[in-house]
Amino acid sequence: MSTTTAKVLPRTAAPGLAVPLLSGGTYRLADRAPEHFTMVVFFRGLHCPVCQPQLRELDRRLDELTERGIEVIAVSAETQARTRQLHDEWDLQRLEVAYGLAEEQMREWGLFVSRSVKEGEPELFNEPGLFLVRPDGTVYYESILSMPVGRPRLDDLLGGIDFWVAEDYPARGEA
């Protein structure tokens, strides 16, 4: 497997994403048609204590996102069994959660990839990333981290989204 990681630029086509859903079936980003954005949240997994509050907040505030025309999917490289475990332990009620992200997919999205350094971590997993993808399939916003901390605060992101939508603000960082 190549260790080359792509750089995903705003205003370009988002990489493909087809992953199994914990609720059944397959999530395909190309099939999504939200009013404004699809929010793709790549999270580390069950072993990550920082992922739990992020996903729980998204789950709790899903209506706020939906009202803004935003669909949300949370994705990790976890197995189905571990994803079921985190879904139950973290008490996620409505957030769509996908699992089985392959290393190649991690790299196509420009995510940092880590190897296990302690018991309880998957052998290979992605570090956090958050993308907003427009209905036309182009990347609008991205936040990619090499460590579990430093994720965008949801309140800050929602404030930005409100402004961007109201002002028809273009994606930046494309040059």
State where each predicted segment sits.
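Chalcogenol-based redox active-site neighborhoods
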Residues: 1-175
